[in-house]
Amino acid sequence: MSNSLIFKSQMAQLNTVLIEERNLEVLYEQLTEKLAKAPEGFFKGAAMVAHLKAVDNVDLSWLMHLKTVFQKHHLLLVGVTQHPFDSETLFRAGLIDVPFLEPKSAKLEGEEEIKSVDLNEEIESSSPHFLSGAAHRKTLTVRHHVRSGQRIYAHGGDLVVIGTVNAGAEILADGNIHVLGTLRGKAFAGIKNNEDAHIFCLEMAAEIISIAGIYQNLEKNAHTTKNNCLITLNSDETMQITPL
């Protein structure tokens, strides 16, 4: 008999959502509000993990209704982390137990920072200390092309990509983004409400660009500037693309 079924261990790209509300009706409204701040379709169909450390007195029925809340937002809840449930309860709910890993403070130069993104961290403003100055920022340098389907997030600092960011790829940074190549995918700078952040690329062909949650869909809104582009956010929340 031929062996046509092979099990392999592989890290999948999962997004983490910190759940701090037990009332699912309130949670539904909160999720609606947060998704409205993200570019249209940014999380549609995304696999999600619920972080449940802050929630207590919940049971299997609550878990099943939680899955429904995600489904109504076109999100797929596949697992939970930091939760009180046993393996039998998770099996009946159709969820997996996802080990909780503390975010790493730094990565070796050239490595990708993370493959999972916290929804709250990504689209909600953060504490004021982030804006205290660039001296405390770290820089994540990626020395290769970013392929379609990849997502790279520079947590707590700037992102430099030495290569092309292909269509379908997403790059995110708490600070600035520099692409020393062609930017074809989606770029989100200053995602913790840093309005002073900027995006620079040698060639602009992006799908979406965003600074501090303000974004432009460049597939729908044509622009003429193509080379050596610096993108900044104006005080009236419009974007300025300047050739250097």
UniProtKB/Swiss-Prot annotation:
Q: Which UniProt keywords apply?
A: Cell cycle, Cell division, Septation
Q: Which InterPro entries match?
A: CAP/MinC_C (IPR016098), MinC (IPR013033), MinC_C_sf (IPR036145), MinC_N (IPR007874), Septum_form_inhib_MinC_C (IPR005526)
Which cysteines does the record link by disulfide bonds? Answer: none
Keyword Cell division carried by entry? yes
Gene3D superfamilies according to UniProt: 2.160.20.70, 3.30.70.260
Q: Name one GO biological process term.
A: regulation of cell septum assembly
The source's domain of life comes to: Bacteria
Q: Which PANTHER family match?
A: SEPTUM SITE-DETERMINING PROTEIN MINC
Listed under subunit, the entry gives: Interacts with MinD and FtsZ.
Question: What functional role does this protein have?
Answer: Cell division inhibitor that blocks the formation of polar Z ring septums. Rapidly oscillates between the poles of the cell to destabilize FtsZ filaments that have formed before they mature into polar Z rings. Prevents FtsZ polymerization.
Q: Which family does it belong to?
A: Belongs to the MinC family.
Annotated NCBIfam families = minC
Tell me what this protein is called: Probable septum site-determining protein MinC
